[in-house]
From Swiss-Prot:
The keyword S-adenosyl-L-methionine does not apply. The active site is at R175, S225, E295. InterPro entries: FAD-bd_PCMH, FAD-bd_PCMH-like_sf, FAD-bd_PCMH_sub1, FAD-bd_PCMH_sub2, MurB, MurB_C, MurB_C_sf, Oxid_FAD_bind_N. One of its GO terms (cellular component) is cytosol. SUPFAM superfamilies: FAD-binding/transporter-associated domain-like, Uridine diphospho-N-Acetylenolpyruvylglucosamine reductase, MurB, C-terminal domain. It comes from Caldanaerobacter subterraneus subsp. tengcongensis (strain DSM 15242 / JCM 11007 / NBRC 100824 / MB4) (Thermoanaerobacter tengcongensis). This is UDP-N-acetylenolpyruvoylglucosamine reductase.
Length: 302
């Protein structure tokens, strides 16, 4: 990356941080991924807005990163600038509403809700991502989704205007929102909850997290559920019924605890995971005629 660009980015990121040739495996739950040319961590909302405006003006490619919990990044890494939102994590409570920035983790928001005796967000307490990423993909668990609790979302559009989208305008559906079609960036969101009882909320969070521990391979790096649920089926059951439970390619393996997860057993490469995804898709299509679509996002130079 040209020195002049780095100097300009440093000028913009007075509170933030800048890393050159930063290995993405340090920033993804899969623990896989080569270097980002530049990793920028804006220190505030204004720094994020100014940074994005500059990158767009100079036509420098960029990629927005939350917690990296739903990503498979290639060993060749990501060209341009990876913008990590980890410092944008302010959360405030107004009555029964929580207003949270995009980089706030779902578990932290769930704990804020608990402390303020607000119910409705328990389902998200064990999802290991950030609010921004969860909204973009309408993340969900245990029968609830972001669309059930998100009242409105503030985004930065492609012309660097700030827009507020209602729940309806987000066009939420299963693992989908309108943001997947746009070059818009989540800044913050309003989460609408209900008054509840501290002990009951805590009990529900503990029960859901216990279920998660029992059923999911949390001891290994992964990116959560590998595939979206096909209509009328469960991806994990199809994979298991296809005889692929425990099947591995290199260091990538179909979890024996839950076949819907691909895990990194220690030294998996990008292509180990990619080849395993494609092999699972092929076998499930041949045996059951069902097309499995990846839920994880695949990024970087192939």
């Amino acid at each position: 990356m040209a020195e002049i660009l780095v100097d300009k980015l440093k000028e913009i990121l007075k509170e933030g941080k800048l890393y050159l040739n930063e290995p993405m495996k340090r920033h993804t739950s899969f623990k896989i991924g080569g270097p980002a040319d530049v990793l920028a961590v804006p220190g505030s909302r204004d720094e994020l807005i100014n940074l994005i405006a500059y990158l767009r003006q100079e036509k420098i490619p960029f990629f927005i990163l939350g917690n990296g919990t739903n990503l498979l990044v290639s060993e060749k890494g990501i060209r341009g600038v990876v913008v990590k939102l980890s410092s944008l994590r302010n959360v405030i409570v107004e009555g029964t509403k929580i207003i949270a920035e995009a980089g706030a983790s779902l578990s932290y928001i769930a704990n804020v809700a608990l402390v303020h005796e607000l119910t409705g967000f328990e389902f998200a307490s064990g999802i290991p991502g950030t609010l921004g990423g969860a909204i973009v993909m309408n993340a969900g668990a245990y029968g609830s989704e972001m669309k059930d609790v998100v009242e409105k979302v503030e985004v930065l559009d492609e012309n660097n205007n700030i827009l507020i989208l209602s729940n309806q305008e987000m066009k939420f559906s299963y693992r989908y929102s309108i943001l997947q079609e746009k070059e818009w960036i989540v800044l913050r969101a309003w989460i609408s909850l209900e008054r509840g009882n501290y002990e009951e909320i805590k009990k529900k969070m503990e029960e859901l997290n216990q279920r998660r521990k029992e059923k999911q391979p949390l001891d290994y790096p992964s990116a959560g559920s590998t595939f979206k649920r096909p209509p009328g089926y469960y991806a994990g059951k199809l994979i298991e019924d296809a005889g692929l439970k425990g099947y591995s390619i290199g260091g990538a393996k179909v979890s024996e605890k839950h076949s819907g997860f691909i895990i990194n057993t220690g030294n998996a490469t990008f292509y180990d995971v990619l080849n395993l995804i494609e092999y699972i898709q092929k076998v499930v299509k041949e045996k059951f005629g069902v097309e499995l679509m990846p839920e994880i996002k695949i990024v970087g130079e192939k």
